[in-house]
UniProtKB/Swiss-Prot annotation:
The gene is nusB. Involved in transcription antitermination. Required for transcription of ribosomal RNA (rRNA) genes. Binds specifically to the boxA antiterminator sequence of the ribosomal RNA (rrn) operons. CDD domains: Terminator_NusB. One of its GO terms (biological process) is transcription antitermination. It comes from Nocardia farcinica (strain IFM 10152). This is Transcription antitermination protein NusB. Belongs to the NusB family.
């Protein structure tokens, strides 16, 4: 058997279902931005297409969770990303990097079943697969700052979701 090149874009490790779901979410967010359509609407369109056309793979539940989550929190997610960009604006980033960062930031803030290190590592892997040579270190740098505030954001979100205890009389 011939030896495969050890190039950075051709990793032969087995990709898990969550990695594939994240990649699909990045693809959908990228497409929604390129077509200037709402990501949640595109998600619905793709789900409908998958039910009508068997050649189109159905969407993984986690892909739906990510795209819906990012779409619902887009302003907050983008604001967070922008606050950690040094000498850059969100609009100057490659569109694929924006999509990768949006997925990762949403996961850091809302996916309590995903350890922060996993969210960052997955984003860096996606940047290696899908973007420029400089993108993995850039994505890692931005997310390295976001990860520092993620526990407070998660705690605040949990506190607002928790049922309030009425004082006993």
């Amino acid at each position: 058997m011939a030896e495969q090149p050890a190039d950075k874009k051709s990793t032969f490790k087995k990709l898990g279902a969550r990695h594939k779901a994240r990649r699909r979410a990045v693809d959908l967010l990228f497409e929604a931005e390129a077509r200037d359509v709402d990501a949640a609407d595109l998600l619905t369109e793709r789900a409908d297409l998958a039910t009508r056309d068997q050649s189109v793979a159905p969407l993984h539940a986690y892909t739906r969770t990510l795209v819906e989550g990012v779409a619902d929190e887009l302003e907050r997610v983008d604001g967070t990303i922008e606050s950690y960009l040094q000498d850059w604006t969100l609009s100057r980033l490659p569109a694929v990097d924006r999509a990768i960062l949006r997925v990762a930031v949403w996961e850091l803030f809302h996916a309590t079943d995903v350890p922060p290190v996993v969210a960052v590592d997955e984003a860096v892997e996606l940047a290696k697969e899908l973007s420029t040579d400089d993108s993995p270190s850039f994505v890692n740098g931005v997310l390295g700052q976001v990860v520092l505030v993620a526990p407070q954001v998660r705690a605040a979100a949990a506190a607002t979701r928790a049922p309030r205890q009425e004082p006993e009389a």
